[in-house]
UniProtKB/Swiss-Prot annotation:
It comes from Prosthecochloris aestuarii (strain DSM 271 / SK 413). The gene is rpsP. GO terms for molecular function: structural constituent of ribosome. One of its GO terms (biological process) is translation. This is Small ribosomal subunit protein bS16. Signal peptide: none annotated.
Length: 135
């Protein structure tokens, strides 16, 4: 069985993962069939590059993505786009749906960043209040 999974590369404490199509019996960093993307978790923000045509090919011939690889494919919107194609939507509908999806994702990211900033500020204020009351 062919799996779409991550293959670790990079150096110590600075991982870079290649998204590969590999035989399920092969070791994690061992023999693989094809490199179909790259994931850099240490970049800010993390970056995912994927060759969409090759991923569609491998999924089309029955390759199964691992849980982590599937979440990365979902984060890029590739699985959503393939689902729209499978439902028989026209190319214009797919393009408009993907644009809406992209807007929702960017809004979600902005919301997360705002929550993170609020929490950071609240923590800073609490520490300042604790320092002031300690004096």
């Amino acid at each position: 069985m062919v799996k779409i999974r991550l293959r670790r590369a990079g150096r110590k404490k600075m991982p870079v993962y290649q998204i590969v199509a590999a035989d399920a019996r092969a070791p994690r960093d061992g023999k693989f069939l094809e490199v179909i993307g790259r994931y850099q978790p240490t970049a800010k923000p993390h970056s995912i590059t994927i060759d969409k045509e090759r991923v569609e090919y491998w999924l089309g011939v029955g390759a199964q993505p691992t849980t982590t690889a599937q979440s990365l494919l979902r984060a890029t919107g590739l699985l959503y786009e393939m689902n729209l194609k499978r439902k028989g939507r026209s190319e214009e509908e797919i393009v408009s749906e993907m644009a809406q999806w992209q807007e929702r994702q960017s809004a979600r990211l902005q919301k997360r960043l705002a929550v993170k900033a609020r929490r950071r500020q609240a923590k800073k204020d609490a520490q300042a209040a604790a320092a002031a009351s300690a004096e």
